[in-house]
Regions:
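P-loop NTPase catalytic phosphate-binding loop
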Residues: 78-87, 106-223, 231-303, 307-322, ...
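Conserved alpha/beta core segments of nucleic-acid transaction machinery
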Residues: 331-445
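Short, intrinsically disordered, mixed-charge
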Residues: 21-25, 62-70, 103, 156, ...
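Residues within the DNA-recognition helix of helix-turn-helix
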Residues: 60, 154, 423
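Short, hydrophobic beta-strand segments
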Residues: 1-6, 39-50, 245-248, 376-381, ...
Length: 445
């Protein structure tokens, strides 16, 4: 093994003889067969002597970390090899930037429908995932582990590749912190949802939309969204639902949320609807058995305990991650890979969003907010005279401008959402506007 790896890393931990001696001190004999020096950690492939149990080596992770003066050491078997991987942090870690990943040729491949810039592997190779094949994603990690940055990089990856006509987002952010910066971008199908009760209703609308899409695809004789879009000029957009803090929703409407998510995760893939859920509390009451069963693809950033690691991944190891974007990615094939997620600053995110807002206005689907508000108390309509005057004004406005949407009436007439939605419904009954089509738009008849 080349000693120049140790010189490059300026770290005796990359010296194979040094690590072999530490293991021998604990009664584990074997040889370091290969060293892979990555941007954040160095992978030592250790071949144990005959008769040495893997569990014995894995249990030495804390002792190896102490003897190498490292923050942590992660030990795991390497699939398809007779070696055990010992991952030790580098003295200085390289930054991984989003621009490096999206400029990679793999990102532009046509067969990747919804590309996600996952980051770099231990060896420094850019890794790109496809949300359509996942088809849903569960993310967990403590505060400061890089979870929120990961959500941002996923959103930006998709926005970078697909136009608002090709992909729409529904963003649910009970914390009112991370996703509010995307308010007003043209890719949004409705405003960012910050109320937990309203979020449950919005997920109910997504289930309804999924069923509507299935009926449409059955009528056309196609099996999925790609088959439908290949037949039509007006494409059916993908819908990506992003939930930033799952635990807040589970506290308010746990069973209802779980039922909706179960339906969507089992059936929504063919309809082009995908869910990305994140939580900083990966306990069994948040990540229930039902949710785990339907989210085979998961990402775990640094967690506080082995129990949390087992809850999200089914095995320990996430508690030994280094934070700041260091993660374990579990694919649907149950293979776990360590990846270093790319970083994107708040300033960059805001610049991108400002640019997107300058390009076009969001075209909200009125039915979503109507669906979300239907359980809430409506406005007082006791003053019939005012109601009639307002309705006549709205009809004149719609006929003059040729636009019919709830958000348009809200802006022009300066009225609340409930009233605007009811006026649109009345216009539909009176034959002034058409029913909403599959993308939520209405025509003035």
């Amino acid at each position: 093994i080349k000693k120049n790896i140790a010189e490059k890393n300026n770290n005796k931990n990359s010296d194979p003889e040094f690590l072999e001696k530490i293991l021998l001190d604990f009664g584990v004999e074997g040889k370091i067969k290969k060293i892979s020096n990555g941007p954040v950690v160095t992978l030592n492939e250790f071949e144990p002597a005959p008769g040495i149990k893997v569990s014995k080596i894995i249990n030495l992770s804390e002792d190896i970390a102490r003897n190498t003066s490292s923050e942590s050491a992660r030990i795991a078997t390497i699939p398809g090899k007779n070696t055990v991987g010992i991952e030790i942090p580098n003295l200085s870690r390289e930054n991984v930037f989003l621009s490096e990943i999206i400029s990679d040729e793999k990102f532009s491949k046509k067969d990747i429908k919804l590309p996600i810039a996952l980051g770099k592997s231990i060896s420094g190779t850019p890794l790109i995932g496809d949300l359509t094949s996942m088809p849903h994603l569960l993310i967990a990690g403590t505060t400061g582990s890089g979870k929120s940055v990961c959500i941002n990089t996923i959103i930006l990856s998709i926005i970078y590749k697909l136009s608002p006509e090709q992909c729409k987002f529904i963003m649910i952010d009970p914390k009112m912190l991370e996703l509010s910066t995307y308010e007003g971008i043209p890719h949004l199908i409705c405003p960012v949802i910050t109320e937990a009760k309203k979020a449950a209703s919005v997920l109910g609308w997504v289930v309804k939309e999924m069923e509507s899409r299935y009926k449409l695809m059955t009528k056309e004789g196609v099996r999925n969204i790609d088959g439908y879009n290949s037949k039509h000029k007006l494409v059916m957009p993908y819908i990506v639902v992003v939930v930033d803090e799952m635990s807040d929703l589970m506290l308010v409407a746990g069973k209802e949320i779980e039922n909706y998510i179960q339906k969507l995760s089992q059936m929504a893939r063919a309809a082009g609807i995908h869910i990305i859920m994140a939580t900083q509390r990966p306990s069994v009451d948040v990540i229930t058995g039902t949710i785990k069963a339907n989210f085979p693809t998961r990402i775990s950033f640094q967690v506080t305990s082995k129990i949390d690691s087992r809850t999200i991944l089914g095995e320990q190891g996430a508690e030994q991650l280094l934070g700041k974007g260091d993660m374990l990615f579990m694919s649907s094939a149950n293979r776990i890979v360590r990846i270093h997620a790319p970083y994107v600053s708040e300033n960059e995110i805001e610049k991108i969003n400002s640019f997107l807002r300058s390009q076009a206005e969001p075209d909200y689907v009125d039915e979503i907010l109507n669906f979300a508000d239907e359980k809430e108390t409506g406005e007082n309509y006791s003053d019939n005279e005012n109601k009639d005057q307002l309705y006549q004004s709205a009809v004149e406005l719609v006929k003059t401008d040729g636009k019919a949407s709830t958000s348009y009436l809200q802006r022009k007439l300066q009225i609340g959402y409930n009233r605007a939605a009811r006026i649109i419904d009345m216009m539909e009954e009176d034959g002034i506007v058409s029913k909403a089509n599959h993308v939520g738009k209405r025509e003035v008849l």
